[in-house]
Amino acid sequence: MVHWADYIADKIIRERGEKEKYVVESGITPSGYVHVGNFRELFTAYIVGHALRDKGYEVRHIHMWDDYDRFRKVPRNVPQEWKDYLGMPISEVPDPWGCHESYAEHFMRKFEEEVEKLGIEVDFLYASELYKRGEYSEEIRLAFEKRDKIMEILNKYREIAKQPPLPENWWPAMVYCPEHRREAEIIEWDGGWKVKYKCPEGHEGWVDIRSGNVKLRWRVDWPMRWSHFGVDFEPAGKDHLVAGSSYDTGKEIIKEVYGKEAPLSLMYEFVGIKGQKGKMSGSKGNVILLSDLYEVLEPGLVRFIYARHRPNKEIKIDLGLGILNLYDEFDKVERIYFGVEGGKGDDEELRRTYELSMPKKPERLVAQAPFRFLAVLVQLPHLTEEDIINVLIKQGHIPRDLSKEDVERVKLRINLARNWVKKYAPEDVKFSILEKPPEVEVSEDVREAMNEVAEWLENHEEFSVEEFNNILFEVAKRRGISSREWFSTLYRLFIGKERGPRLASFLASLDRSFVIKRLRLEG
């Protein structure tokens, strides 16, 4: 099957016509931390642009920061004194943490740094700068000239939604009072560049559209941007794409006011965290950021989460055991891509998903240290980073001859596994090696089996996990010991739990003499 990004790219070429350069856009209001749900907007635009580039076209990806929006409410994690700034542009509200020029910049810079780590090329633009330097002046004036047409379009959809029509004194723009920097009521337009306003403080005056104090309202601003930048594609959340939404009105406004066609759009679903109720909200603070994912995932896996899901499918990120499954799935797709492992009928789509997931496509299969096993090894206190690498080599998980690139990836995964165990691993995955054998009842048959395994280990300095696994099963089977009794006894002896990691590979990772002593209940 064709990957969904390639399908949309082909549709753009077909419906927008052949061009040397296409423009894709994404946009976010930095009213709080920009979370993994917000990122889906940017990545959807990016991956479609990526598909267009792969077809030989030049692409400009604009990401619009709507930092000229009003500061509407004080988030939980912000001092309540910030209520004094309500109604001001968020680009002019001070940073509560004192590390950036403004409230908006605090959140924008963090997200920009996070996106850069994913190898995503994007042109970040700032609405506050564009308005203040008069970039949109002509389009704003045109919106005033076409005010009646805009009201007609909006009222048509308001009537369908059984909402009252816009008041007669409605204008397609708002004014930020030059003195108090709050939204002011527009009283009059002189038919040219001047607008008369009255601010909540009672102050009245005239302001020039070109001064940067006049800002279009959202339902006009969005189609104006499409026209100004020649946007060919912009994804949107379903709240913007339902019947009568801002996309529907925007399609008509761009045509009737600016004489152009609306870009193609694509609805994307929400991104949530498994086990968390409700939507993430940057202003509420119940969010997971890209930087949180970077603590446990390689950059390619972060991109893979979004690339593998069609945009109309909700994503639930499982930071618990789901992380182990995600690594397993990604590693399998990577092996299929490099022809190391066979797949099924969807090989083409899987290979394309891998291509679109990688910030920089590797020329060969770089060593894959199984994350599931690393989550076990990082809990063994006697193993250093180099020891872990040696265990992986000895047990056949990675090759003996490691390149610099191989070593870097393995070490990265070791650190990511440590972070995962510390922050997200369920309690039944965590364990610690008991310093002394616990007092447990051991039947005579089990004791004999343990002694036989200890003797086998004494006689085998080198062995494979498969050989060791066979011995563990054979000694128990020969004595009629049930797997449940046998394995639970061994787990209790080493980690004090009924269950644990895969036993053969786990015990083979421990010091051999320690395992022998513990099996003999000597220490």
Curated annotation (Swiss-Prot):
Instruction: Quote the EC number.
Output: 6.1.1.6
Q: Which GO terms describe its cellular component?
A: cytoplasm
Molecular function terms, GO-annotated: ATP binding; lysine-tRNA ligase activity; metal ion binding; tRNA binding
Reported cofactor(s): Zn(2+)
Classification via InterPro entries: aa-tRNA-synth_I_cd-bd (IPR045462), aa-tRNA-synth_I_codon-bd_sub2 (IPR020751), aa-tRNA-synth_I_CS (IPR001412), aa_tRNA-synth_I_cd-bd_sf (IPR008925), Lys-tRNA-ligase (IPR002904), Lys-tRNA-ligase_SC_fold (IPR042078), Rossmann-like_a/b/a_fold (IPR014729)
Q: What class of enzyme is it?
A: ligase
Q: Give the residues the record marks as binding Zn(2+) 2.
A: 177, 180, 199, 203
GO biological-process terms attached to the record:
lysyl-tRNA aminoacylation
Which reactions is this enzyme annotated as catalysing? tRNA(Lys) + L-lysine + ATP = L-lysyl-tRNA(Lys) + AMP + diphosphate
Membrane-traversing stretches: none
Provide the cofactor note recorded for this chain's UniProt entry: Binds 2 Zn(2+) ions per subunit.
| One matching Pfam family | Anticodon_2
Q: Where is this motif: 'KMSKS' region?
A: 279-283
Task: Output the PANTHER family linked to this UniProt entry.
Answer: LYSINE--TRNA LIGASE
**Family to which the UniProt record says this protein belongs:** Belongs to the class-I aminoacyl-tRNA synthetase family.
Q: What is this protein called?
A: Lysine--tRNA ligase
**Gene source species:** Pyrococcus horikoshii (strain ATCC 700860 / DSM 12428 / JCM 9974 / NBRC 100139 / OT-3)
- Identify the gene encoding this protein: lysS
